[in-house]
């Protein structure tokens, strides 16, 4: 269930990045993603996914026609802060409380 929650948040992050790119006139069609990011990638993502080991928990959403030519044609996102937050929530839950 926790993975589903993370996956839904990742989907929201991806959709926001896609919208930003589309608002700037681009047509995002690829995701370059690290292996950690891919673990939480929803199956219904409509972009072609390429795994790049070095990206870790990050991903780059881009319009492949302009990637490397125009900086605004790509958006890098990271789920590392989200994963760290979930880890801290687990730690806090395990702390015994005094009653």
From Swiss-Prot:
Does the record bear Ion transport in its keywords?
A: no
Please verify whether the record's keywords include Lipoprotein. no
Q: Which Pfam families match?
A: ENCP4
Query: Which segments cross the bilayer?
Result: none
Report the SUPFAM superfamilies cross-referenced here: Hypothetical protein PF0899 (SSF111057)
Compartment(s) of residence: Encapsulin nanocompartment
Provide the alphabetized UniProt keywords: Encapsulin nanocompartment
User: Which GO cellular component terms are attached?
Assistant: encapsulin nanocompartment
Similarity annotation: Belongs to the encapsulin family. Family 4B subfamily.
Oligomer status and interactors: May self-assemble into facets and potentially into larger complexes.
What's its job?
Answer: May be the encapsulin shell protein in a type 4 A-domain encapsulin nanocompartment system. Its cargo may be upstream glyceraldehyde-3-phosphate dehydrogenase (AC P61879).
NCBIfam families the record matches:
encap_f4b
The name under which this protein is listed is Putative type 4B encapsulin shell protein PF1875
Instruction: Give the originating organism.
Output: Pyrococcus furiosus (strain ATCC 43587 / DSM 3638 / JCM 8422 / Vc1)
Q: What is the lineage of its organism?
A: Archaea, Methanobacteriati, Methanobacteriota, Thermococci, Thermococcales
